[in-house]
């Protein structure tokens, strides 16, 4: 990571933050893509040019709930400090309440996606340990897992 003023550059595949890290800022992507994953590696979404990520934990003042990785190319972003986000929403209590509720729903949705993926993984492992010929069911469950991994739910 290279930082100058409020501009940050991450190299391809560089870890931006991990689950459990403290949250003092959000980021506005200027160039490149950032991928967001659950703690167990389920892809939740991809954030690109003109989009913000990291705002949920920053607004809610919690540790990071997802892992953020730079994409295939360099990522350029502008850092948005916590106090700037707070100032933006402080002036409008209705907007602040809407944002907070939306962020809580997003966290819940991310957890549900991870739970579903974990359930499917468990079923696949059980099927793989059996000597029964149930390839069709197994292939179908693998397809569901791939679809879940490609869902576009953004933090």
Where do the protein language model's features map onto the residues?
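Cyclic-nucleotide recognition modules
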Residues: 46-103, 107
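Phosphate-/nucleic-acid-contacting segments
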Residues: 119-155
């Amino acid at each position: 990571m290279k930082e100058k003023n409020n501009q940050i550059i991450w190299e391809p595949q560089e870890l931006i933050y991990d689950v459990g890290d403290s949250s003092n800022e959000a980021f506005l992507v200027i160039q490149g893509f950032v991928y967001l994953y659950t703690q167990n590696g389920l892809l939740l979404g991809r954030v690109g040019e003109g989009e913000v990520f990291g705002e949920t934990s920053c607004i809610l003042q919690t540790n990071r709930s997802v892992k953020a990785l730079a994409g295939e190319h360099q990522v350029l972003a502008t850092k948005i400090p916590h106090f700037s986000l707070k100032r933006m929403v402080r002036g409008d209590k209705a907007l602040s309440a809407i944002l907070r509720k939306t962020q809580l729903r997003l966290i819940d949705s991310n957890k549900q996606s991870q739970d579903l993926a974990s359930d499917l993984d468990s079923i696949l492992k059980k099927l793989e340990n059996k000597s029964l010929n149930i390839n069709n069911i197994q292939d179908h469950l693998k397809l569901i897992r791939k679809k879940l991994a490609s869902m576009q739910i953004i933090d």
